[in-house]
Amino acid sequence: MNGSSANPRAALSSAMTDPFGRTISYLRVSVTDRCDLRCFYCMSEDMTFLPKADLLTLEELDRLCSAFIAKGVKKLRLTGGEPLVRRNVMTLVRSLSRHLSSGALSELTLTTNGTQLAKYARELADCGVRRINVSLDTLDPKKFREITRWGEIDKVLEGIEAARAAGLAVKINAVALKNLNEDELPSLMRWAHGKNMGLTLIEVMPMGEIGAGRIDQYLPLSLVRARLAQQFTLMDLAESTGGPARYVSVAETGGKLGFITPMTHNFCESCNRVRITCTGTLHTCLGHEDASDLRKPLRASDDDMLLADAIDRAIGLKPKGHDFIIDRRHNRPSVSRHMSVTGG
């Protein structure tokens, strides 16, 4: 649906379709730009975070999410930064779970670095969360500290076990990093599959200034897959989630392996998602500088008609594809905002 609705009331519950016929059914919401780690491909060591006064309240985030659910969103993922470091975030999770109970929402989930999972896993499960993604690039404690700048891997592994004990299905997300974890990816896959967890490998994305050259970090997953195919039997799976990952089954482990390849394969043709930052900015594409302010219409009225109309206008601006490219000449990111702000 593009432009303003002729019937504002109808806009409250109208489905969201972009200019290229893609229906938007998946919302990713960054509840904070803060994180208790500083992964070097994601953040600079001396990050300047958003003033807390600029953030939407948890009640405003709930209202914003609910407006998208009314317009057809079926899957909602909370991200960050690290979502579980947001003060009182579980009140938001518990409140949003009402949409699971009503059937309006099919899935409520989150992506986390795992450091807070030991504390929150059981409560997440009690709120109706069934699956989570955990970002983990290595099982080597020394490498983990190097990547995160100060993290302790035992805390993450404890959190993963707490999540599994609570009945949550866990999928591991790992960024492939040249000369750092590339030799470890086969063993990381065996470990994940051995615990009945999926693994998705991700190429470095050129987002935000991080004080390092991404060309030094970038490892094409086409190369990773070719190497894995020398050791394992990889069978392409036909399943599609409307997202960027392409999946294979691994005969030797019985598990599933995903590849997210923004740099080597455009994954935009079936994109079904949009992203909201913790300040209420809507980004219809991860790899595009587009931005629509939803905080202003959210706060302008207690009636959601202005908000619904603003959402429709923003969806009408969703681009056909992303602008990701590594600027080898000037060493500049394709997108100026950091992943921690966008909520990858």
UniProtKB/Swiss-Prot annotation:
Residues 19-244 form the Radical SAM core domain. The keyword RNA-binding does not apply. Pathway: Cofactor biosynthesis; molybdopterin biosynthesis. Binds 2 [4Fe-4S] clusters. Binds 1 [4Fe-4S] cluster coordinated with 3 cysteines and an exchangeable S-adenosyl-L-methionine and 1 [4Fe-4S] cluster coordinated with 3 cysteines and the GTP-derived substrate. It is an enzyme of class 4 (lyase). Gene3D superfamilies: Aldolase class I (3.20.20.70). S-adenosyl-L-methionine binds at Y41, G81, S135, M205. [4Fe-4S] cluster 2 binds at C268, C271, C285. Keywords: 4Fe-4S, GTP-binding, Iron, Iron-sulfur, Lyase, Metal-binding, Molybdenum cofactor biosynthesis, Nucleotide-binding, S-adenosyl-L-methionine. Signal peptide: none annotated. It catalyses: GTP + AH2 + S-adenosyl-L-methionine = (8S)-3',8-cyclo-7,8-dihydroguanosine 5'-triphosphate + 5'-deoxyadenosine + L-methionine + A + H(+). [4Fe-4S] cluster 1 binds at C35, C39, C42. Its cofactor is [4Fe-4S] cluster. PANTHER family: MOLYBDENUM COFACTOR BIOSYNTHESIS PROTEIN 1, MOLYBDOPTERIN COFACTOR SYNTHESIS PROTEIN A. Belongs to the radical SAM superfamily. MoaA family. Monomer and homodimer. This is GTP 3',8-cyclase. It comes from Bradyrhizobium diazoefficiens (strain JCM 10833 / BCRC 13528 / IAM 13628 / NBRC 14792 / USDA 110). The lineage of its organism: Bacteria, Pseudomonadati, Pseudomonadota, Alphaproteobacteria, Hyphomicrobiales.
